[in-house]
């Protein structure tokens, strides 16, 4: 691991210094040597892209994305050995810290889920349906001016938006209900580890589904009606 590599690095640098070499030169020489050695396994592409996930998998690296599962690595035998050998933490201390990590993760997702439910039902859906009503009124006005067939042709875009808004708001409503139920189920789990896993696999996943629908509505509803900050506006908030 990284810790072992750092320990080995210090050991080699100390050996060079003991042999009479200047400290700075010893560090630079060892670094130069290590850079040459690791060149074949370095990845110079975008580490946030799917390309890296594929490449990392080929190299046998862990590509796990679930935080609660990743926390488990602290309790791997090699991890415990590293922490204990360096006098940082004992196995018991690592176990205690992991309990806190799992509990903290759960509480953060829990709070975010509650806020998302509130924003969805009390802000996003009312805003979207208000804009939908404006579109309906526009379509009705067009029908009062033109023959029905021509009016519907001229209002084709608005009719599509009216339908899309209805479908997306219904999906959000169902999603929020499912989100609440997922939280209720997860909250009954006593183990902090298992509860965190449940929050990641069910609650956080449902939040992503709801967010997708809200993001789509954000692109549909006109700016003056959308009271929440849009993504592009967040760039200019001080």
Residue ranges of model-derived segments:
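An acidic, glycine-/histidine-flanked metal-binding catalytic module
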Residues: 1-24
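C-terminal amphipathic alpha-helical interaction region
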Residues: 33-238
